[in-house]
């Protein structure tokens, strides 16, 4: 840990976390960020093998080998696995999506629209209510009608998050050309986030000649939607 990070208040001045944990537990330790490791786990023993097994059981011979993993939480994380190998990149930045351009606010990074702070900001803008003390879970509860507040504003906060995430994912998927899986603390609000994600992934972009093309060259299916999955 190089910097003095808010997420690690007990570690200051630079801590060699890998060697520390290895000595502490007596086992090999591999250190990486949550986005990379989420993607790696889903590729080796999670979503990717689940998709391939389901296809196989239904008589489909095609198998997927590449995966984009996205984490929604304090920030906007990502990781890429290509044919079983985690994409590290020459500078350790492989799969980083947080600093892509924000589709709603092009002068901002994507993470300003895909994060805990984004959910709170949009809810406050849409509802006109102070969000002091409100967590994303509280806002989810408002969307569900289980807590006092503005349900439509709460749903819109998650939808906008999905829209910005979906645009960034579309850019990444055009390069990765594989399946995508979403996780992280905010993923529990998936019923309100996924519509924005899917709508963005199914978006189009035009040419000066007046033609419109899908922003993704491949078809988009929501694995959580049974009707989509059967396609």
Task: Label every model-predicted segment.
Residues 1, 36-39, 77, 187-190:
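Short, active-site-adjacent cap segments at secondary-structure transitions
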Residues 1-14, 28-30, 42, 72, ...:
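Short beta-strand-loop/turn "lid" adjacent to the catalytic site in phosphate-handling enzymes
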Residues 6-7, 91-92, 102:
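Short clusters of small/polar residues that mark proteolytic maturation junctions
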Residues 19, 23-27, 50, 54-62, ...:
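ATP-binding/phosphotransfer module of carbohydrate and carboxylate kinases, centering on a glycine-rich
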Residues 29-67:
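Conserved phosphate-binding catalytic cores of ATP/NTP-utilizing and phosphoryl-transfer enzymes
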Residues 69-71, 76-81:
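Short beta-strand scaffold segments in enzyme catalytic cores
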């Amino acid at each position: 840990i190089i910097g003095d990070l808010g997420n690690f208040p007990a570690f200051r001045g630079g801590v060699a976390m890998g060697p520390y944990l290895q000595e502490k537990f007596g086992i090999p330790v591999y250190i990486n960020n949550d986005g990379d490791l989420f993607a790696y786990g889903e590729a080796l023993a999670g979503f990717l093998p689940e998709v391939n097994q389901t296809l196989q059981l239904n008589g489909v011979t095609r198998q997927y080998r590449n995966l984009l993993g996205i984490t929604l939480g304090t920030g906007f994380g990502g990781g890429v696995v290509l044919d079983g190998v985690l994409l590290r990149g020459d500078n350790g930045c492989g799969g980083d999506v947080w600093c892509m351009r924000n589709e709603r606010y092009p002068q901002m990074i994507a993470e300003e629209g895909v994060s805990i702070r984004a959910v709170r900001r949009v809810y406050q803008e849409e509802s006109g209510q102070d969000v002091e003390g409100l967590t994303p879970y509280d806002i989810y509860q408002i969307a569900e009608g289980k807590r006092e507040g503005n349900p439509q504003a709460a749903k819109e906060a998650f939808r906008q998050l999905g829209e910005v995430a979906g645009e960034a994912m579309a850019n990444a998927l055009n390069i990765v050309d594989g399946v995508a899986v979403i996780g992280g603390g905010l993923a529990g609000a998936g019923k309100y986030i996924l519509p924005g994600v899917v709508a963005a992934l199914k978006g189009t972009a035009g040419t000066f000649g007046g033609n419109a093309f899908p922003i993704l060259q491949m078809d988009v299916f929501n694995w959580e939607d049974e009707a989509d999955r059967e396609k």
